[in-house]
Amino acid sequence: MVVTRSARPQARNEATSVESLRQKNSAVTRLHVHPKGRKGSSPDNPNTTESQTTPERSPAPKTRKSGTTGSLPEMNKPATDGEISEAESDCSSVPEVQDPVFRVTRRRQILVAGTPVSSVRKRLKITRVSESHTEEVVSEADSHVSGISRIMPPTEITTRRSKAKSQREPKQESHVEVISDAESSCSDISFSGIATRRTTRSMQRKLQAQTEENNTKIVLENEKEIIHTPVNLEDSVNRRTSRLLARSLSQINKPNFSNNEIYNDPDDSFFGISGKKLAVKKTRNFTIREEKQDSISPLKEITKQNCKSLDEEAKKIIDGGKEGNEKNSQLNLSEFQDTGLQQLVSQRHSTPESDKTTSESSTLNHEAVMKSLAQTFAVVEMDRWNEERKNAIKTSDCSEPGDGSYSDSDEECTVIGVSEDMSKEKEVDSESDTKPSNLEFNTTQDKDDSVLLVLSSDESQQSEHSENEEDTVCFVENNGNKESLNGDSENLSHDNALFVIDTTPGLSADKNFYLDEEDKAGEVATEEEEEEEEEESEEELSDHDRNKDNEFSDEDNLLSNTKSKLLKLMSSSIDTGLNIKELGGLYINFNADKVQLNKRTLTQMKEKRKDELLQKTVITPEFEKNYCVPPYSESKYKLQKKRRQERQKTAGDGWFGMKAPELTDELKNDLKALKMRASMDPKRFYKKNDRDGFPKYFQIGTIVDNPADFYHSRVPKKQRKRTIVEELLADSEFRRYNRRKYSEIMAEKAANAAGKKFRKKKKFRN
């Protein structure tokens, strides 16, 4: 049930009816009967014990002024739907109710519950989402049952930090009531019944200044009521001693809040039978051991002094608590509904007295812890990483023999707390109560060196310490991975470069690429030896180091391996058929001092440069034979003459620059045969050649066989000759025709000669 602000004026008006109803109830007698009836049960199920101790550990929910006074008359009203819905919720969550008590001051009336061992938490009434506004008005006993019973919704989880924030001193509880109802009610339904609160540094300073005054006022105002109120002595003594232990533990455990968590199995919480003995013992052992492990170096001196006294007090209190816890389990829901109001009143009177007894010891412990932390934090910050592993083994021996049976559950609890804190780190980061509490959180999570969390804070000094701490964390982590990184340094040296000129493709810059067979065999052997050394070094690493390497260097190894493989596959190691040694080696050289150019290439380049220079010089190789030194510049006339001679060498652009060949005897005979072509081949007609001499520009070409021509109609390649005259002489038809013509010509000449002779004779005769 939630009391809103609008219901508070109505609560003030109905305050008188509360007093009348309180007098009419016969709960005073039941107040004495109730603790006795509780003593008859036996601690059978450890899960119910955990659930019953949870209300004791959490101090009472406190609302703003008269926030509960309005809820008292409403709880006394008869309810129909509200009781049924609360009964259903109680049946589903197995409510386990502790002795509730009202603490009455001048202005407000507060619901309080005892805290034997564990963390302190503010609890408000539970809001049912499915219920309507009219169902919120339920009876007083139902509200106590629903407010104190541990309800575990599966969706909400309270982190270790939120639990640690609620581990406040009882003297601070009265001033934390200023927190709004909505904020506290939203955080009411939680895993272990602990509500998170957010306090600033100014709020803490005000609280520390005001708590001492208010505690004395509360005690002075309520001394008379405490004297006249009937209180069960055994119950009050147990409550005081349990609170004394809880506060002394919470003062030391306050900086080390990350592991102060009691794991409650949800399955066991639903089917729990009462068993407080197991839970109290487990809680004590767990908190003592965890505070020893967590405050290793900063709280080393304090814990040595306080752990012994805490162990003695815990044994005494638990021995006395066992007797009371065995008798406190069997109660019906109806008895709680009848006796709830008076029990709240009795607890309310007992709490100021317990506050008075424990205020001095808690303040002394708190001041001692804060002073020692302020003095030793700067000195011990660098040393606590080295001392952490050594002390973790020693502190495990400090726990009692009863820890052995619950070691598995404690380890499970630690794992769950770490995972929850990692997920909720950013949300509850601003809720830190003290500076050492955030800084010690790193030591508890960094035991295994697998999860490294450096918390940030709003305080400037704490941020500086956290930066230093982050450096130390990285230093420790690098020491762990030093061996694995040394093995991969050779591969990563050339893979990390963005732009690499591939001097020796596919390999590192130190290795040779073009190797002989012997060199290759030697290099393969060296690579195998290096791989074996790396494997041996990896085998020497422990399982813990391998886990760290897998977490931090799997991706780097993947990238480096793929890069090296791609380089080997895509490198220019293909045989190109060129001998680079003969060509003078690679054309890119990184070492400028070791440049060795080939001598042949140098001489060739020098000769070319000399020829180019000598062409323009006057001094030529035959300079000695000249009679005079040639002029450096020629006249225009001589230049024109040279150009004319150059032009005469070719037939011009019209003949495509045909050059004039040199006339030889063979060329002259060919030209004569071409002139006589008409007489040599009478069957064809040739144009008459009027030229007397030989042509200046001509070319003699070759006949290209036409594939369309008949084979015998063309001259085969074997029968072809070098000149035209030789081909004519080799032709039989030409020769036969040439003989016949030759004889005819010779006969004519002879006839002509005889006729002239005959004519001459005749001439003389006449």
Swiss-Prot record:
Principal subcellular localisation of the protein: nucleus
- Which positions carry Phosphoserine? S139, S143, S146, S180, S190, S236, S248, S250, S258, S334
On assembly, the entry states: Forms a ternary complex with DNTT and core histone; interaction with PCNA releases DNTT and H2A/H2B histones from this ternary complex. Interacts with ESR1, ESR2, PPARG and RXRA. Part of the small subunit (SSU) processome, composed of more than 70 proteins and the RNA chaperone small nucleolar RNA (snoRNA) U3.
Pfam families registered for this protein in UniProt: Fcf2
Coiled-coil region:
515-552
A GO BP term here is: ribosomal small subunit biogenesis
The protein's name in its UniProt record = Deoxynucleotidyltransferase terminal-interacting protein 2
Q: Which domain of life is it from?
A: Eukaryota
Residue segments, region TdBR region: 558-615
Provide the cross-link position: Glycyl lysine isopeptide (Lys-Gly) (interchain with G-Cter in SUMO2): K217, K254, K327, K394, K568, K594, K616, K636, K659, K668, K696, K741
Q: Which GO terms describe its cellular component?
A: chromosome; nucleolus; nucleoplasm; small-subunit processome
Kindly state which keywords UniProt assigns to this record, in alphabetical order: Coiled coil, Isopeptide bond, Nucleus, Phosphoprotein, Transcription, Transcription regulation, Ubl conjugation
Tell me what organism the protein belongs to. Bos taurus
Q: Where is this region: Disordered?
A: 1-99, 155-175, 345-367, 390-450, 520-557
Record localization? Nucleus; Nucleus, Nucleolus
- Residue stretches of biased makeup (Polar residues): 13-28, 42-56, 435-444
